[in-house]
Amino acid sequence: MDKIVIEGGVPLRGSVDVSGAKNAALPVIAAALLAEGEHEVRNVPDLADVRTLGKLLGHMGCEVVRGEGDRRTVRLRVPAAVTPEAPYELVKTMRASVLVLGPLLARLGRARVSLPGGCAIGARPIDQHLKALTALGAEIRLEHGYVNASVPGGRLRGTVFTFDAQTVTGTENVMMAAALAEGETVLRNCAREPEVKDLGDALVAMGALVEGAGTDEIWIEGVPSLRPLSHAVIPDRIEAGTFLVAGALPGNDVTVRGCVAAHQEALVEKLRAVGAEVTKVEGGLRVIGDGRPRPVDVRTAPHPGFPTDMQAQLMVLLCLADGTSRITETVFENRFMHVQELIRLGAHVEVDGRVAMVKGVPELSGAPVMASDLRASAALVLAGLAATGTTEVLRVYHLDRGYERIEEKLAPLGARIRRVRG
């Protein structure tokens, strides 16, 4: 099993490029199921989850290939007849596999999809997906770990539906389903993340009638059919945010290229609050970590609030602050599993339910640590960069689900980091 080995305490200087957003690429690729023909999705990161979705679509009868000259381009050929099944063997490691449910129901009128896997960071049920699809006219049964769904009459019907809680994949799944439904659909209390807007833009490019994607209310007028997709996904705001935090670590100076400043407002506000210098530059943001960070209080929230996917990374910065910070996690339970590993590096963190009190220490010291989920693994890499001595990050398969060869991106900045194949 691979591990990442870091010799920490070395200042980072230079520029780093942001890959395409995994959480935008996955729903856009799933949307290809809505239309027969040849599709092209650009700026796609080469990540485990993306490869898994490609295997899943291949199982369904689609042809999925990476561009020979441009590995960031994925081309898909979707046949008229698609096998509407997502077996457990292919989706057990990837929560986003549920995104095929809406397109399959909309185009084929039936689907059998295994309940999803992914990071073990608390209960992330798909009940909102199923309630909304039922409101669109689907009949759904949960049997033997699978969602068995069908559409009496063959075509979903438009509806008005309010999500009980904001859900990104739920909003995306229902948007895709409603794109081919008969009549008008109005979705309320929708997730407002940039990835939702990106999917809306992709659907519009396919000929869908969608308005309001990226706001809390989305209007969709169903059409009989859609044309093949051609779309470039947005940059990954969480990868960009991870590099921004790296730049804010004491003594560092990092420019993050391809970073969309509008997607980083909540994080930038906190970075400036801790004392980092953040400036807009051509094509991105520059961050300078000037001295020891100041403590701040952080509360995660759905977009446009502070992203839960950046909570662990920011905690690393606050572990070095001159004072005590408070982090409140409101989105997911069990999202402090990285804390025990940070403590191994010398951090002083106490957790009580959804609140973590972070008492800053002058320095961290390297040690072997074990990743528990995707964003925790990124936090441990950041901690290893800041720590003195050697840090080994184990279970980096979590890291590879969301970061495209992170060691190759950090090394040109001066980081002493390498992957050891296991």
From Swiss-Prot:
Protein origin, superkingdom: Bacteria
Function according to Swiss-Prot or TrEMBL: Cell wall formation. Adds enolpyruvyl to UDP-N-acetylglucosamine.
Assigned EC number: 2.5.1.7
A GO CC annotation given for this chain: cytoplasm
Biological pathway: Cell wall biogenesis; peptidoglycan biosynthesis
Family: Belongs to the EPSP synthase family. MurA subfamily.
Keywords from the named record: Cell cycle, Cell division, Cell shape, Cell wall biogenesis/degradation, Cytoplasm, Peptidoglycan synthesis, Pyruvate, Transferase
Gene: murA
Active site: 119 (proton donor)
Entry binding sites for phosphoenolpyruvate: 22-23
GO BP, one annotated term: cell division
Any GO molecular function: UDP-N-acetylglucosamine 1-carboxyvinyltransferase activity
Residues that coordinate or bind UDP-N-acetyl-alpha-D-glucosamine: 95, 124-128, 309, 331
The species this protein was found in: Anaeromyxobacter dehalogenans (strain 2CP-C)
SUPFAM superfamilies from the UniProt entry: EPT/RTPC-like
Record InterPro entries: Enolpyruvate_Tfrase_dom, Enolpyruvate_Tfrase_sf, MurA_subfamily, RNA3'P_cycl/enolpyr_Trfase_a/b, UDP_GlcNAc_COvinyl_MurA
Protein name: UDP-N-acetylglucosamine 1-carboxyvinyltransferase
